[in-house]
């Protein structure tokens, strides 16, 4: 057993690895000659926790003295012989093969350009956020990340350029340290062993390293985006949050008191608010908004699929207070009109397709699943468009949401999912929704990068969405942003007393007082307002803005109240693109007809209009369908996709063989075994500009 120090050094001249050892532990220098090129190395040893010295131009790996020196020699030989497999992490073939491993989207993604920082960024602030994220998602790497960071001796402050350069070098060093793990003699016992069938240690760890480094680069990029925000952007967020809070107060009043209806009654409209969740407006400044584009280019705008707490986000991307009021109160001018002017009120949700806002849906995940289909169309049509799908933690329990994330993860779609944990879904506490440590763990299960942000801070929404968008449009695929927040109101307006408690104390309210106090102190409006002042905003300017926003919302409410109610007969218009629906009167008239009356047909009983042939070249239903599919493929070219189960090999019963024979293999898309996402994503793909043909393989499914 050695009593000195030992390890391996790398010759900078020829790249040969040489073993070394000293007589005792006190020796801190080695003087050796390379056996390959005779280059002499005189190096001062610098022990590091990663086992790697960084002095001069030499790389030194020190091993524990308890390890047999023969294993050190063997390690050097392996390094020189390059015995670590240079496996392909992801197949480069256009179509999947059975042996192919799951794709790692964003495999070696890194930001291309530096961002401009509005002020110097303290090194300690970056390190703190980096270690916080590693503690959240990869706690086993805390010491490694800290050791490599400190060893690189960063400057006390960064600007955009120096930060970009340093973090690029930092990621390279961390990646090298991760790759070194398998060389350590104490791990040689699992060398070549399968971690799981068909994935040996080297390959498995290499893939894990790639995923880890992807997460680290995204974390550092979020820090960069947060450092590039100026005062004007903060003031814009404050304006949007103020507008949202003013809307909330009006919506509460409308629900409580109602407005007069033509029949002499009262109607209070939809009953949802966004209290304490207004910070989501920060996402909008990271998006390519439709309202900022010319009409002919609005199909290139980013798409959002907000839920009921995301009124602020809808306002921030361009919906007006009048649009929100009209939709929530079901007035004729609502965009929920089925495409027929003055026929609003069919649904009481927000939404405006021309502005890139999908309406929320009562089956909660439908909007997210549809947005996933729109993202699929963007990828297939090579449209540079990003998609954002926020939901609550309750919705994340739904199978259709999982199906959407799974498809996005499998196909690398340009979408960010956002799970906003506001601590309760109606009256179901978070502990009843999931056993995962964080809701971000759900993304990890799909191979999707995920992280957590504080939902009271619009800056974190902005930075996360910006990083997700850049990553997605660079080909990295989907991300999952987990938001910890809390709703400061009941599920709906009528629910406040049960949730928060009545002013009389009866009912007392069931929400935890400690939880309520914690999040009340984080209310984004007053806190962000104070922050704006701390970085240079003018108090008078803020007061003026607040009065202006209140006046805008007040005027919108007045205009909504003067807007006519929809005529009842408009509800049947445009239910499909081909025909109107029957009115109740028309349905009753049809029911009242004698059901025993049999209309005369063109044929008598037993007669056939078509004789079916038994000839081998005769047409069949399946052949007619095959011919129709080929005709559609040739008519619509790259705008069509045939999507379903088992599409890319041949299709059930060989239905897709003619398509492949005619050169249309690229139009076939295998879908996960999830019938709901097949239909929902096909719907989204149609909205996104494609002609999807969705196939459910068997009727019994």
Regions found by a protein language model. Name each.
Residues 1-7, 24-26, 44-84:
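Short, intrinsically disordered terminal segments enriched in charged and Pro/Gly residues
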